[in-house]
Amino acid sequence: MISVFDMFKIGIGPSSSHTVGPMKAGKQFIDDLIERHLLEKTTHIQVDVYGSLSMTGFGHSTDIAIIMGLAGYLPHNVDIEAIPGFIAKVNKTAKLPLAEGKQVANFDPATDMIFHKTFLPLHENGMTITALADTAVLYKQTYYSIGGGFIVDEAHFNQQEEHPIEVPYPYANAADLLRHCQESGLSLSSLVMKNELALHSKVELENHLHQVWQTMKACIHRGLHTEGVLPGPLKVARRAATLYRMLKANNELSNDPMRVIDWINMFALAVNEENAAGGRVVTAPTNGACGIVPAVLAYYEKFVGALTNEIVERYLLTCSVIGSLYKMNASISGAEVGCQGEVGVACSMAAAGLSEILGGSPEQVCIAAEIAMEHNLGLTCDPVGGQVQVPCIERNAIASVKAINASRMALRRTTSPRVSLDKVIETMYETGKDMNAKYRETATGGLAIKVICS
């Protein structure tokens, strides 16, 4: 089972597949060296990066992420402020301290990290790391970053868990979830809670959900109070802080019934601007789509009612289980299925979560998730300059509003839908696989080649 601990991971921007995943792969490689007693013998490290991971790698800070992983750090606890200085020293000395300095290896990023235009056979995001003793290969491993910060090595690709923990309500699709809810009388979030408690203690679960929401709130706050220009050649100006000042100044005087949309946009922009700047964010389900789930919950708090711990937990658990359906039966990787697998999935998750805390039945929750994805089908991933900025930041704002609209449509529907959530998930995956590779996070088509970076 894909847990809420897997779906919502605290990490850093700008990309879950191209930053968080590669950093975790680097750290896993170092852990493997330590386990095999090879770390102290390692004198040289080489890295080969392939496919989408290579084509948009520099814009997504993939090179930096791999180096920091090899240095022994993970996305949730790496000191973000210390990264630039660490990377500058590695570039200057061509030496890389491994495992937080336990061993120092020769590593010149200019020659020892090669970005290939070719693809590895199993997934669009591949990388191979090699440890050497002088010229002799000590250990070599290929990893795939399969979206949302999930990684898998070559030997375990597409393999099921050997000894999965049994949960009271196992499921493979939305139909299973709805059947369990109908038979048990449980809400969707209550059912997910019971499954999670088979994997984690109540304290662990509550602490994780609390930490996830607090991290999301802190990210919104930073985004609303930080101005300037985002890193990279596009020179994109931050907009959330300016919009915040405008809304605060005019909120009490405005009779515009649409001003709520400005607030929703602002919440999403704040998060995604922080992500683009390499800040601390939560995968939801990915970094490129990390603004939607928090923006919709912030909307609830601002315009619907106060947030209790129970409401936050119900929202996040519902979002998580909907995301898990896409992860199990389709993909949450922009490199594999385009942006429909990132922003589309996040929109679907948030629509479901909002419907749950507004009192929707399990059927209405799944209808909301279906509506949200149905109208994201075919969404391309064509980041300008290989950066998670244009069109990604605005796209999160648009999808946040769309998620709320999908929820409202589902809750006010009086007829049965013709399209099920399972069918739209199946359609999304097939659409993504049919999509030309230039529209799947390679920056070789669409807006990515129409907008010239200065």
Q: Residue locations for each model-derived region?
A:
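Hydrophobic alpha-helical bundle architecture
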Residues: L307, T318, S324-A397, M409-R418
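Short, mixed-charge aromatic SLiMs
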Residues: H44-G57, K89-P97, L243, Y315-M328, ...
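Extended hydrophobic packing segments that form well-structured cores
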Residues: R418-S454
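Accessory carbohydrate-recognition regions in carbohydrate-active enzymes
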Residues: I12-M55, L122
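Alpha-helical support elements that line or immediately flank enzyme active sites
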Residues: S17-I34, P294-A306, A351-G359
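Conserved phosphate/anionic-ligand binding catalytic regions in large, soluble enzymes, centered on
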Residues: F8-G26, A277-V296, V337-C347
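C-terminal regulatory domains involved in ligand/effector binding and gene-expression control
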Residues: P75-L253
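Accessory "access/gating" subregions that flank catalytic or transport cores
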Residues: K202-G334, G338, G446-S454
